[in-house]
């Protein structure tokens, strides 16, 4: 987050998000995931990757019609992104082994809902 006011209600609900302040170690891209000059990195402050970003405009400009979603948490950011992706008419795939949640029951329930309503849930082997 760039300031104490950004996403204040979201951060009040989930205080651990306060560890994600701009410039801190908790927001660095893992060095095992190399980022080149040609890559586009999007900064987000809310659950969905689409909310208050230009991700949809950029994806459409690139001719993208399908997304593979990975990340944390299944019940939060992953689900919100999958729902918004569907609303923007993307074919959405969530890789079950590449998402997680602090609550195993919430993880399973959200994968079930995503598969039933918003996209496809698969294993990494299914992507090939």
PLM features: residue spans?
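Active-site-adjacent betaalpha module
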Residues: 3, 10-128
């Amino acid at each position: 987050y760039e300031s104490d006011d950004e996403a204040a209600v979201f951060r009040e609900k989930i205080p651990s998000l306060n560890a994600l302040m701009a410039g801190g170690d908790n927001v660095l891209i893992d060095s095992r995931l190399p980022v080149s000059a040609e890559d586009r990195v999007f900064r987000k402050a809310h659950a969905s990757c689409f909310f208050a970003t230009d991700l949809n405009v950029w994806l459409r400009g690139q001719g993208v019609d399908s997304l593979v979603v990975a990340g944390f948490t299944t019940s939060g950011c992953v689900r919100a992104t999958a729902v918004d992706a569907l609303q923007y008419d993307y074919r959405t795939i969530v890789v079950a082994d590449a998402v997680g949640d602090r609550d195993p029951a919430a993880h399973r329930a959200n994968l079930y809902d995503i598969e039933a309503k918003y996209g496809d849930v698969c294993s990494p082997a299914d992507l090939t």
